[in-house]
Design a protein with these regions (language model features):
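Structured C-terminal helix/loop/strand segments within mature extracytoplasmic catalytic/sensor domains
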Residues: 1-9, 33, 169-196, 203-206, ...
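Mid-domain, small-residue-enriched loop/turn segments at the edges of structured enzyme/sensor domains
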Residues: 16-20, 115-172
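Short, glycine/proline-biased beta-turn/loop segments that scaffold the active-site neighborhood
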Residues: 62-88
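Short glycine/serine- and small hydrophobic-enriched flexible loop segments
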Residues: 54-62, 116, 163-170, 264-268
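Beta-lactamase-like hydrolase cores
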Residues: 1-43, 265
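Active-site SXXK
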Residues: 30, 43-71, 235
Length: 273
């Protein structure tokens, strides 16, 4: 396990009280190169949107959905934070573009439109068919959560998430990875790879990365595949902690530094260093 495991252990002590679930495995064999509490189920914010994309891709593959189908946003779908559609004038988009917005910029409005189209129950059923017990998308995206709403958007464990990403990759080129490939959030583990967040679909510096992140107060999650000259790795780095709402609090900085440290170890491993 070497340097990857060492970086994971350093992360565990980076922020007092933080809970981590971490797993890194070989892309081809599934052999572990590092882990810590990989079965712990933590909040994963937007990572759970993967399940909606998987359900859509499955329907397309079975001929039950057409990516050219145009869907409209409604007032009930509107939500702030991540995404572009809320800033665009267009009211309707084909499902292909809705999925690309979710994969590329974790678009919250597009997520709500897709979930309304698919049905949240179908997404839950898909998770069960995939054999997932911790990885769940619990709800639509909301600006505020009331006591009547599920307390978190999504959850998961590092072990199940690395298994899910590895399965997506082993199935060969597919829609879900195509939607994730241009993803612009390289601010967490992937910040160590030194790639252009806006243009990294092609191999750069000998590296190729596909990932999905999740961000909320006290939640950071990065799940991905990184391939280099020596090998490919699948990783899931999840962390939950109590983040004070004070300008001078450094807990987030410590968490981000630890995630980048893990990314540096992953980069060295896939490069053969």
């Amino acid at each position: 396990m070497g340097d990857v495991q060492s970086a994971i252990e350093r992360a565990a002590f980076s922020e007092h009280g933080a809970q981590w679930s971490i797993s890194a495995v070989d892309l081809d064999t599934g052999a572990s190169v590092g882990e810590r509490d990989p079965d712990a189920c933590l909040s994963t914010a937007s990572v759970g949107k993967l399940l909606a994309l998987i359900e859509l891709a499955e329907r397309v593959g079975r001929g039950e959905a057409d990516l050219r189908t145009v869907v409209a946003r409604t007032e009930a779908d509107r939500v702030a934070d991540s995404g572009l559609w809320q800033h665009l004038a267009i009211e309707e988009l084909p499902l292909a573009d809705v999925a690309m917005l979710i994969g590329t910029v974790s678009d919250n409005l597009a997520t709500n439109v897709l979930l309304r189209h698919l049905g949240l129950g179908s997404v839950h059923h898909r998770a069960g068919l995939l054999g997932l017990s911790t990885v769940q998308l619990h709800d639509r995206v909301r600006d505020e959560r009331t006591p009547d709403d599920p307390p978190r958007l999504s959850s998961g464990s590092a072990r199940e998430l690395t298994g899910l990403m590895r399965r997506l990759r082993s199935d060969g080129p597919g829609l879900v990875l195509d939607w994730l490939r241009p993803g612009t959030d390289l601010s967490l583990v992937a910040s160590a790879f030194g790639l252009d967040p806006l243009a990294h679909v092609l191999v750069d510096r000998g590296l190729r990365v596909i990932n999905k992140t999740g961000t909320n107060r006290g939640v950071r999650a990065d799940v991905g595949i990184v391939e280099g000259p020596a090998r490919g790795l699948v990783y899931a780095v999840l962390v939950n902690w109590t983040e004070p709402a004070t300008p001078d609090d450094r807990s987030r900085d410590l968490v981000l530094d630890a995630m980048r440290d893990i990314g540096s170890a992953l980069r060295a491993t896939v490069a053969g260093g």
